[in-house]
């Protein structure tokens, strides 16, 4: 079953699990229809829903973390939420179409993981998300950035009160998932 409603191009999707009368698990995608209902209740946010990002989100959700997700292309986000509906993620994944709504969904201090290509893509995400972050928030680059770029980013963001961690994620598709 899929329930879809719209509001100001700021859809928010959550995956929920319901037990059916026959012991089956049904997954439903629920879209919240009021912008004012955006609450800061996600433990961590992840930007970048390629294979590694998707599997890391599912891993965190399986372990009880409430995870907000954002991707540059919303079509990939919707596709991931359809996948999530078939996974035992326990309703712990929420997807956002805008960076602003994504950041607002995170509990403080906010923890944001980026799993995007090193270089220009990483830099673009940092520049886009930086005005939305506050002192004490944490930004983690899980890509394979050049070490000298990581040092420069850490220094720049520290000056703004943002904790920056450059820590490339490895282990492949299955390593991220399990």
Where are these regions (language model features)?
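NAD(P)+-binding Rossmann beta1-loop-alpha1 motif at the extreme N-terminus of oxidoreductases
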Residues: 29-97, 101-108, 136, 165, ...
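Glycine-rich, highly charged phosphate/nucleotide-binding loops
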Residues: 94-100, 119-126
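Short glycine-/small-residue-rich Rossmann-like dinucleotide-binding loops
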Residues: 116-118, 144
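Rossmann-fold dinucleotide-binding core
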Residues: 122-127, 146-178
